[in-house]
């Protein structure tokens, strides 16, 4: 929906603010993706907390409720030419019983960039929730069904893409599973 550059269309009842619902058929993939993002946000209270995040460890859990990152974990880049941004939502501040942490990575550059991921507790793994650069699944995997990152330390984010990762205690990357199996065989 274009507003032809008008940022104050909320107060206009004319073709500038009218929505053409017939465009939904033509843009059904985008419409489905946005519906999934809205549903995902509603199902995780970390993305709609009752109080604004404090960006500090006010519960003495070892991590802040929300932290900002750049291409390097824990090192945000706020200069005007930076085009990469990450945000870590600590699950321990969630009101949900699952206490799942999330990491969002925004690459606004026209080239792919590698992001360092915040470390998770032992036995937990980062799993992809959605990736706007992934066309095969319309960018969104059913919750808990996304690929587990093989490299839990860093991830390549595509050009002009947004990715969301969730902490998953149920799955481990293949390397970790092989290492555990190797230790059992050695015993």
Each model region followed by its residue ranges:
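Carbohydrate-interacting/catalytic domains
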Residues: 1-187
């Amino acid at each position: 929906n274009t507003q032809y550059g008008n940022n104050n269309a909320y107060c206009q009842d004319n073709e500038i603010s009218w929505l053409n619902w017939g465009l939904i058929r033509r843009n059904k993939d985008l419409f489905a993706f946005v519906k999934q993002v809205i549903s995902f946000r509603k199902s995780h209270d970390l993305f709609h907390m009752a109080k604004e995040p404090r960006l500090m460890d006010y519960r003495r859990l070892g991590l802040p409720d929300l932290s900002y990152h750049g291409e390097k974990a824990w090192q945000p880049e706020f200069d005007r030419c930076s085009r990469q941004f990450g945000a870590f939502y600590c699950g321990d501040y969630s009101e949900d019983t699952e206490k799942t942490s999330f990491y969002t990575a925004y690459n606004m550059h026209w080239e792919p960039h590698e992001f360092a991921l915040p470390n998770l507790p032992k036995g937990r793994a980062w799993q992809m929730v959605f990736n706007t650069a992934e066309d095969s699944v319309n960018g969104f995997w059913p919750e808990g069904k996304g690929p587990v990152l093989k490299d839990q330390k860093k991830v390549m984010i595509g050009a002009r893409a947004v990715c969301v990762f969730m902490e998953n205690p149920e799955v481990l990357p293949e390397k970790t599973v092989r290492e555990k199996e190797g230790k059992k065989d050695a015993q």
